From Swiss-Prot:
Keywords: Amino-acid biosynthesis, Arginine biosynthesis, Cytoplasm, NADP, Oxidoreductase. It comes from Pseudomonas fluorescens (strain Pf0-1). The gene is argC. The lineage of its organism: Bacteria, Pseudomonadati, Pseudomonadota, Gammaproteobacteria, Pseudomonadales. PROSITE patterns: ARGC (PS01224). Pfam families: Semialdhyde_dh (PF01118), Semialdhyde_dhC_1 (PF22698). InterPro entries: AGPR_AS, AGPR_type-1, NAD(P)-bd_dom_sf, NAGSA_dehydrogenase, Semialdehyde_DH_NAD-bd. Pathway: Amino-acid biosynthesis; L-arginine biosynthesis; N(2)-acetyl-L-ornithine from L-glutamate: step 3/4. It is an enzyme of class 1 (oxidoreductase). HAMAP family: ArgC_type1. Catalyzes the NADPH-dependent reduction of N-acetyl-5-glutamyl phosphate to yield N-acetyl-L-glutamate 5-semialdehyde. It catalyses: N-acetyl-L-glutamate 5-semialdehyde + phosphate + NADP(+) = N-acetyl-L-glutamyl 5-phosphate + NADPH + H(+). This is N-acetyl-gamma-glutamyl-phosphate reductase. One of its GO terms (biological process) is L-arginine biosynthetic process. PANTHER family: N-ACETYL-GAMMA-GLUTAMYL-PHOSPHATE REDUCTASE, CHLOROPLASTIC-RELATED, N-ACETYL-GAMMA-GLUTAMYL-PHOSPHATE REDUCTASE, CHLOROPLASTIC-RELATED-RELATED.
Length: 344
């Protein structure tokens, strides 16, 4: 049984971790922290978890207690894991970080996008980017795993087959992405109010979103060279979901794109390449650790359109974190994650 600690259990990714781990036959959450809710029973904050975590209460983060865990998840704002990850690693505890703290390899680049100096640059070299479809073998041997962001997950999985095969013009890629409101987090903000988001949709951060350097970093690895990417995120009136519409120009029109995608993801338990001509819906992955993909070449031209959908809280965050845990501890990768999406 893997003993699990969670730092930051009161946000959406924290409660999603609790929900998923409640169904995991080989994991036990033994400590969950929140400075603001210390002493409050988990079931009192989250009634949906009644009967699953009886006796477990939020506590103030304590290195000794957390260090007794096999693995600690950080479901915290950026900067928090910087301060604690090193001490936990020194105690022999594995760290899986859902924040952006260790996703970028360049500390200066991180500081540029997150507006503060990187707090643990000495750990960047050993941090493994936790996209299992790319780094599965590195994840198996890791001590510190950086779980990819939601937009980067959907976007990279959509572009990877094209770039790895070298059949797309990597200098001109476009990612037009839509997100549900839960992607903004649980904190109170005017822009997330029901009356502000319902029956409306808008683009934001067109000048540059924090996920842009992360996406570029991953696509650069796949292409083996620098990439040109235009990334435009949108806020949509739904709670969960990411829908990425991705555009690329093919340089070899002889390639069977459907076969290319099917072959690339044939052995991936959480990537579903849909039949040719399909249009995946975000509702089909709600609550599931799945990326559902369809590839199109309109009018048999040079432009490829890839449609990629995920649940931003599951495959885009907590589900992918549990997937990483399974790999890290030599468990069946699908353990605790095989449930279907919720319809309607």
């Amino acid at each position: 049984m893997v003993k699990v600690g969670i730092v930051g259990g009161t946000g959406y990714t924290g409660v999603e971790l609790l929900r998923l781990l409640a169904q995991h036959p080989q994991a036990e959450v033994v400590v969950i922290t929140s400075r603001s809710e210390a002493g409050l029973a988990v079931a009192d904050m989250y009634p949906n978890l009644r009967g699953h975590y009886d006796g477990l209460a939020f506590s103030v983060p304590d290195i000794k207690t957390l260090g007794a865990c096999d693995v600690v998840f950080f479901a915290t704002p950026h900067g928090v894991a910087h301060a604690l990850a090193g001490e936990l690693l020194a105690a022999g505890t594995k760290v899986i970080d859902l924040s952006a703290d260790f996703r970028l390899q360049d500390a200066d680049e991180w500081a540029k996008w997150y507006g503060q100096p990187h707090g643990a640059p000495e750990l960047l070299d050993e941090a493994v980017y936790g996209l299992p479809e790319v780094n599965r073998e590195q994840i198996r041997k890791a001590r510190l795993i950086a779980v990819p962001g939601c937009y980067p997950t959907a976007t990279q999985l959509g572009f990877l087959p094209l770039l790895e095969a070298g059949i797309a013009d990597a200098s001109h890629l476009i990612a037009d992405c839509k997100s549900g409101v839960s992607g903004a987090g649980r904190g109170a903000a005017v822009g997330s109010l029901y009356s502000e988001t319902s029956e409306s949709m808008k683009a934001y951060a067109v000048k540059g979103h924090r996920h842009l350097p992360e996406i570029r970093q991953g696509l650069r690895r796949a292409a083996g060279k620098d990439v040109g990417l235009t990334f435009v995120p949108h806020l949509t009136p739904m709670i969960r979901g990411i829908h990425s519409t991705l555009y690329a120009t093919v340089v070899d029109r002889s390639v069977d794109l459907q076969a290319l995608f099917e072959k690339r993801y044939a052995n991936e338990p959480f990537v579903d390449v849909m039949p040719a001509g399909s249009h995946p819906e975000t509702r089909s992955v709600r609550g599931a650790n799945v990326c559902r993909i369809a590839v199109h070449r309109p009018q048999d031209g040079d432009l490829v359109v890839v449609l990629s959908v995920i649940d931003n809280l599951v495959k885009g965050a907590s589900g992918q974190a549990v997937q990483n845990m399974n790999i890290l501890f030599g468990l069946d990768e699908r353990l605790g994650l095989s449930h279907a999406g919720m319809l309607p």
